[in-house]
Structure formats: C-alpha cells, structure tokens
Amino acid sequence: MTASDGSDNSVILEDILIGDVWVFSGQSNMQMGLQEADGGAEAIAAATSDMPIRVLSVPKATAKTPQSEIGAEWKHCTPQSLPKLSAVAWFFAHHLRQAPELQAVPLGLVDSSFGGTAIEGWTPEGTLPNIDKSQLSGSLFGIQAAHLYNRMIVPLTVYKVKGVVWYQN
C-alpha cells in the first residue's frame, strides 16, 4: 500500500491486513499459553506466516496514568510467536475461521492478560466508587485500581475493535 501527499512524498506500507481485531484479557485462565493447552502443540506446529492472522502480546506492566505506547509489535503466526499466546485467543480465532462467511476475514488477536490480578486493576479511573483501599480485591502483585487499564488497555484504543473476550477466574 502506498500513501502519497500528491507531491514527491510517499510512504510504502507492506504486509498490511485489514480485518477484525479481537482483544483477549483477564486473569490466569486467559493468560494460559497455547503451548500448555490440549491441542496447542499441534496448533503451534501447523502455524505458518501466510495465515491471515496476526498476534499482538501486550507486555505485562502497570502505570499510574494512561499510556499511549503498547511496547509490542504485531507478529505473524509462526511456531515462535504462538507458544505463549493465550490459548483462549487462538482457539476462539480458530472457531471464527470455521464459519464460511468469516474465512476470508483477516484477524488480529491482542493478548492483554495478566494472571493473579484483581478486576479493579483493569477498571478505568473514576468508574469505581470512592471506597477504602482495604476493601478492594487482593492482587498477587499489589496492583492498584486502574493501573493495568492505564498500561495494558488504553494503548489499544487506537484500534477499531470487533470485540473483547474477558476471562475472570
């Protein structure tokens, strides 16, 4: 794809897919990698870079304020890019690809999961009532309300998302 301003300035973009972006988020069951799932080894071995699916694994991190940088790049489906991808994300995509009307639609799978975290960390600032911090759900990592949302969800708002799959234990 070439974009030009009408003069001598142009930008060439290669390997572009236009399709549906799905976000997968939640706790440890969503975080479970494809390599750990029944049928995962076979799915990983069968992956080829010409599949019309791209994956984006958001780094596990927090922030006190909303961030704009994702800190990761879209990757082709290969045996190297899939082992730690959410198994739920992969099998969901596989299920979508079985529908005849969706077989030609490229898919973007965003894995933004973090096991052992409380729901409050994934909730935008100001959406929770003012409650004492001692009443908030515990987190294995001591993550504060909105801190996961700020770092692992807000940067994704640049994408038009088809849907979100949430898996809270």
What do the PLM-derived regions correspond to, one by one?
Residues 1-169:
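Cell-envelope and extracellular/periplasmic
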